[in-house]
Each structure stands twice: as structure tokens, then as C-alpha cells.
């Protein structure tokens, strides 16, 4: 990823240092903190049951963001954070607990937060990529004051920053609840035994009060199909599938429900759904790896 950033934007202003090792005294003053902490523990490439969230080795990198916001004197006015949408349901034993911990952490640090799950293809992009984006506003900011004057529903469906960029309409009843202000209690007790997360794909939190609801995207532009971005011309042979391998590819991409044997001799039932093969050029590209 670091090499790609350098190639696209040049080496100036780019750093590949581990943020966990950088003293906050060396981080310059900034108005906007952007972060996309690793998603291996939340990704749809693994099952929810195996997701470790904040407990997992990768998930704890969230606390690097928390450390910066806790230690620097002049906190950034705005936060722009992103993760896979599975974050709203993680971990499997306490649906939504990890996101609740993050929201309460940001509340403790003096921020209001709004979030939305956005699929890039729903707004004209050439890839089906679903991610949750959450924006934070410091309590002394102009946006926070505007949010405070508005009602949660007006903000989420009319006045909010996300809504004014990515239009959406209400698709469910509104749910409201208050987060416990003790992070340890949230970590231990939030939604224990709950089969469904309390967080929908759209919502906001201000002063610990959460408002959340389902929305659906509203986009009046044209979709961008995969064929419109593919390079024209001869395709190198290394990217071609020999005809002799097509049956194997069709099997791998097809639906399955079969018995398999593990390395230690355990017989188990393996099942998975099918994937389109070959990819439909008239549709936006599927998400690489996770195949949404």
C-alpha cells in the first residue's frame, strides 16, 4: 500500500512509519485526522464468529488513533474514519460492541459522530465496495454547533454533511439509545447475547445519545460499468485462462455443498454460494477478494 501511495502521489509528505511508534509530540498540528485501521478482524473474507474486533491483534490499532487524540493538546477539529461495514456488527458474541466502544471513546474525547455505510457503486463508482464512514466533529466546531441545533433525523436525512454529499432516504423505524459512559462496562456488557446489532447503516451520536436507522441510497447519475474502465487492446497471455482450466474455474466460482476432510481427518460439510463467472462487464466491478 505504501508503494502505491508513493507511486500515485510522490514521496514528498509521505511516511511509512508505524504510527504506534511515533511520539505524539512529533505529529504536527492538523485540522483533520483521517484513519482507516486494518480490517482483517472485521472483514467479510472471514466469518463473524471468527472476528476478534478490538480484542484481536489487528483491531487494537484503533487505540493508536485514540492515543493521538488523547495526548495532543490541540485536537483536530474533524475526524474522517473508515472501515468495513462488518464493524457495526462485531464481535459475534456482542453484536456492535466494538463500534459502541469507539463511539463512547470519541464522546469522552469531545466529539460528536455521524456514520453511514456507503457502497461506492451506488453513487456511480465502477466498484461495489461497501464501507462504513464515520465523521467526528469537535465540540467547539461550527459543525458541532449546527448539529446541536438540528434534530437527529433532520441531520441524518436533510442537513448533515454525509447526507448533503451522498443522498439517502429512510428505510426503517428510528432507534434511539444512550451509551453507558464507562468503557469497561460497554466492553463487558454491551448487547451481550444479542443476535442483532443495535447499529443500523446510518446514525449519529452526540453526548452519548445514539440515533440510528436504515437508509437506502438515492443517486440520479449514471452507473459506471466495468467495461467502461477496462484498457482496450490485446490482453497479455499471462492474464488469459487456458481452455483446459475453465472447468476448474467454473467449479471454484460455483455454488458448493459437499463433504470435505481436514488435514487431521475430520469430515465436515463445506458450503458456499456462487460467484458470477466471468464478471459481468455491464455491472460495476465486484469488490476484489471479498466479492460483494
Where are these regions (language model features)?
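Flexible, glycine-/basic-rich loop-and-beta segments that form/coincide
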Residues: 125-203
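Residues that flank catalytic or metal-binding motifs in active/ligand-binding sites
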Residues: 102, 114, 128-132, 284
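Short glycine-centered segments of the SAM/dcSAM-binding site in methyltransferase folds
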Residues: 78
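A SAM-dependent methyltransferase catalytic signature shared across enzymes that methylate proteins
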Residues: 100-117, 138-142
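Core alpha/beta nucleotide-donor-binding catalytic domains of modification enzymes
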Residues: 1-75, 83-99, 107
